[in-house]
Amino acid sequence: MIDRYKHQQLRIGSVSPQQISAWAKKILPNGETVGEVTKPYTFHYKTNKPEKDGLFCERIFGPIKSGICACGNYRVIGNQKEGPKFCEQCGVEFVDSRIRRYQMGYIRLACPVTHVWYLKRLPSYIANLLDKPLKELEGLVYCDFSFARPIAKKPTFLRLRGSFEYEIQSWKYSIPLFFTTQGFDTFRSREISTGAGAIREQLADLDLRILIDYSVVEWKELGEEGLTGNEWEDRKIGRRKDFLVRRMELAKHFIRTNIEPEWMVLCLLPVLPPELRPIIQIDGGKLMSSDINELYRRVIYRNNTLTDLLTTSRSTPGELVMCQEKLVQEAVDTLLDNGIRGQPMRDGHNKVYKSFSDVIEGKEGRFRETLLGRRVDYSGRSVIVVGPSLSLHRCGLPREIAIELFQTFVIRGLIRQHLAPNIGVAESKIREKGPIVWEILQEVMRGHPVLLNRAPTLHRLGIQAFQPILVEGRAICLHPLVCKGFNADFDGDQMAVPFSLEMQAEARLLMFSHMNLFSPAIGDPISILTQDMLIGLYVLTSGNRRGICANRYNPWNLKSYQNQRFDNNNYKSTREPFFFFLIHVMRLELMGRKESIQIVLCDSGGNQSNALLLQEKLPSKFTMNLRVPIMRFMDIIQQQEVQKKKFFVYTFEPLLVIFLFTEKSKKLYKGFFGPTHMIPNHMVSKLKNSMTPI
C-alpha cells in the first residue's frame, strides 16, 4: 500500500517475477506459503463465502470482516496476547479488512506470455530492441512461426536444419504428430523455439550497452553516406536513422531504470486486490461483478488446461499443446487490453468486456477520475465566462466561491477588528453577508492569488495563478487571451480554484498568467486570439456585406444604409432588427421576341441591389415565413433569351426597381415592385449609360 505521507510520486514500469511474487506471498505459521490463485471460482453458491485459492480467497487477500477469519473466530487486531496472528484451521490472517484493497495475488503461468502493451502498442518496444518486424514477432508469439536454436556441439534431430526456420512451416504439420507431450516438449526445448518463450530468450541474450554501441556505429555510417539522389532510398535511410535513435533511447531508459528487457515477457501474472474488482449483491439476490473477474477466470481456466496437458496427459499431440499456449496468450491479452488484436471479447448481451486498460485510461479511468480529479479543501469549481474588461493577470471570482475560499481569513479579520468575539459569531455574520463582510473579503483578497486549473492538466499552463476580484453571478470570469493555455472555451467549461499557503508562494514566483506568455514546449506565443475573438473581429471588419455578417456599426453599412427601409405611409426611417429582415417576393413576367436582354435589379436610390432571381418558386418554407434568418443573396446580372418567361424575385428591398435593357431596340424598360416610386430622369439616364449592350 502506498503511504501518502512517505511517497510523493508514482512511477509505472515493468517489474521482475520475484517482485510480483513478493507482493503476494505470505508464509503461514505452519510453514505453508499462500498467494497463488489456482482456481477460477469466486464465491460458493450455498455458503456465499469465498472459495479457497480462488479469486476472492480470504487466505490470499485477507478477511472480509476485520478480525474475523473464515471459520468465524474473532481476534482483536493488534493484540499480541490474544494468540497467533493466523487462524490455525483456515489460515486467514487476523487483520483489518481494508487489506483487501491492496493485497495482491498472482497466477503462475504454464508458459511465458508477452505483455501486449510492449508488443502491440506503437512503437513496439520488443520489436525495437530485437530489430525485427512486428508481423514476424506476432507470428512467433502466437505460435505461427518458429526458429532453430543455435546448437553447436549437441547433435541435431534432423540434418536439414533449414526446415526449422520460421519461414518454412512444413514441420508444424509433420514433426509434432510423432511425439507425445513429454517427447515433443523435450524436442522443442532442444531443437526449436516458438511462442513467447522464444521472445524471452532473445531479450535475455541482449546486452543493452553493446546494442547502443552498434546502433551508434550504424547511425554514423548512414550519416556519412549522404544523399544518394534516389528519393526512395533516401527515405529508407531516414527511416532507419530514426529507428536507431528510438532504439538507443529505449535501451538507455532500460539501463537508467534498472529494468531487464526479459521482464516484458510474463511468467507470473499479478491479480488485482478484490476490492478493486468487486462483486456486489443487488436487489432480488442478483450479483453484479466486475468484468475483470470474468477475464481472470478465462485466464485461469486456459492456464489450468495447459498445465494438465503438460503434466498429466502423456498422449497429447504437440500441436495441441501449442494451440493451448496460443489460447493462454490471447486470454492474457484480453485481460490487459481487450480488442487490441482485433475483435474484442463480448459477454452474452453483446457488451464489450472492460479490460485493465479500459479501467485505468480515459476521462473516467482510475487516474483521472479517482486520483487526479479528487476535491481538496479550500477549493471551488464553476463554469467560466469571458471577462474582456479584466487585466491579463486577474480573474473574476463569484462571491459565493470567494467567501468559502477565504472564510478563515475573514473570520480572523472580524475577530481582529472586534466585530465578533469568537469564531461562532463570526461565522454567523458571514452567513448574514453584511457589507462589512465584503469589505474584509476584498481586503484579504488583495494579497492572496488563486490558482485556476482546467482538467485535463496536460501541460504546465493547465494551471495558472491570478489575482482575484469579486464579481456578481456564479461564473468565474476569465480573460480571453489566456484560454489557449488552458485549452478552454466558453461553452460550459468548468475550472477549479485550489488554495493553500504553499500555492501562494509558488504562484507569485512562477505561475502568474502575465509571466507565461510563451509556450514552454515550442516557444510560440500562448496568449493569442482564438475562437470567439477571431470570429468577432471578422464580423466587425467585414466590408459591405449582408446577411449574418452585417453590422450596423460598420462604416460601410452605415454609408449605404443597407439595413434601412422606408415606410411610405409616414415617411419615417426605421430599421429592422439586427439578425432578422423581411423577405419580399415578386412574380415577374417578361414578354418579347427571341432576343438577349440584360436584367438589372436596383433599389430606389439607383444602386445595384442584392436579390435572388429564379425561374422556379422556392418551397413554401422559405416564402411563407415573413421573418427568417438573414441569407446571403447574390448580385444578379444575367442574359436570357425570352419569349414569355416567368421569374420570381426574392429581395430584402421593398422598393425594388427592375430595369430591362434589350439589345435590338436599345430601349430601357422598367418595372416596379412595391409602392409606386418615381425615378428621376437623371438617374435613369445614368443607369442607361452605365449598361453595355450585349
UniProtKB/Swiss-Prot annotation:
Short name of one Pfam family: RNA_pol_Rpb1_1
Main location: plastid
Entry EC no(s): 2.7.7.6
Subcellular location: Plastid, Chloroplast
Alphabetical keyword list: Chloroplast, DNA-directed RNA polymerase, Magnesium, Metal-binding, Nucleotidyltransferase, Plastid, Transcription, Transferase, Zinc
Entry-linked InterPro entries: DNA-dir_RpoC_beta_prime, RNA_pol_asu, RNA_pol_N, RNA_pol_Rpb1_1, RNA_pol_Rpb1_3_sf, RNA_pol_Rpb1_clamp_domain, RNApol_RpoC1
Keyword Plastid: yes
Ligand binding (Zn(2+)): C69, C71, C87, C90
Listed GO CC annotations: chloroplast; DNA-directed RNA polymerase complex; mitochondrion
Residues at which Mg(2+) binds: D489, D491, D493
Function comment: DNA-dependent RNA polymerase catalyzes the transcription of DNA into RNA using the four ribonucleoside triphosphates as substrates.
Record family assignment: Belongs to the RNA polymerase beta' chain family. RpoC1 subfamily.
Protein name per the record: DNA-directed RNA polymerase subunit beta'
Species of the source: Gossypium barbadense
Gene coding for it: rpoC1
